[in-house]
Amino acid sequence: VRFTNAYAACHVSSPTRASLMTGRYPASIRLTDWLPGRKNWPFQRLLNAPVEQHLPFEEITVAETLRDNGYATAIIGKWHLGKGDSNPLAHGFDEHIPLGYNEGWPQGYYAPFRLNGYEGEEGEYLTDVMTREATKYIEEHKDGPFFLYMSHFAVHDPIQGRKDLVEKYRRKLATMHYEGDPYILEGNPDDPDPLTRGELDSLVHTKAYQGYRVLPQRTVKIKQHQDNIEFAAMVEAMDESLGITVPVALHLDHGS
C-alpha cells in the first residue's frame, strides 16, 4: 500500500489526536508530545518543549460543535488527551467506551482487558470488541445525526496479534527469504560527538548491539525487513474493523 497524499500533524499520537479534535496545529495548543511527555536526556543539545498535560478546555472540539448542533456524539477506544476532568465527556462527547479509561494504551489485547471495569469475555480480542461496539452504536443511532470517533487502541504496545492472523503471518514469513543485515545503525542527531558511518556499520556486528534494543545516547536501530508477525496481525485486524464499520455507516439512509 502506498500513501501518496497523506498528512499527520505530528509523528506521535497525542498531538495528532488534539489536531483532529480541534483543527489546530500542535504547537498552537502547546501539546507537542505524547502525554505525559518524555524526560530530558543529559546528552540532548536542546531541552524538550513544555507540554500541556491535557487538551485545553478553552479549545472547541469537533465533538462540541456537532453536539451543540443536535448530533449524538461518541468516542470508542483510545482518548490519550488527558486524565481526570479532561476526559471525552468534558470535550463534547456524550458517550465514551470504555468509560473512564483515559490511558494511552491497554494492558493487553485479550480479555480480561482491565479497562476501568470494561473486561470483555474470555478469549475476546480488543480490536474486534471495539468494532462490535462501533457497529452497535451506529445501528442504535441510525435514525438521527451522529458523530462517532472510532479510535482503536491498536496498533500499539503491547504487540499482541489475533491468534488466527498470527498463524497466517507465521506461515507467510516461513516462505520469505532475506539476505543481508537484519538492521542498520543510525547516529542520534543529539549526540555531541557523532559516530561516523564507518563506525556505525562496524558496530552492527558487536555483541553489545544484538537484538533490537535502542541505545539513545549514541545510536538508533533501523530494521531492514519486517518480520514481526504479531504486529502484522494487529494491522490486519484493524483493517478488518474499518472494512466492517465504514460500510455499515455508508449504507444508512441519511448518509451519516
Question: Which functions belong to the PLM regions below?
Answer:
Residues 91-92:
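Short, structured coil segments at secondary-structure junctions
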Residues 7, 74-77, 151:
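Active-site neighborhood of phospho(di)ester-bond hydrolases with catalytic His/Asp-centered motifs
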Residues 11-12, 16, 22, 46, ...:
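Residue-level signal for the start and early helices of compact helical domains
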Residues 27, 81, 155-157:
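Active-site micro-motifs of SAM-dependent methyltransferase domains
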Residues 1-61, 65, 71, 95-96, ...:
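Active-site segment of extracytoplasmic enzymes that catalyze sulfate/phosphate-ester chemistry
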Residues 14-23, 51-85, 112-146:
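Active-site-proximal alpha/beta segments of enzymes that process anionic O-linked groups
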Residues 1-4, 32-34, 85-86, 96-256:
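Active-site-proximal cap/lid insertion segments
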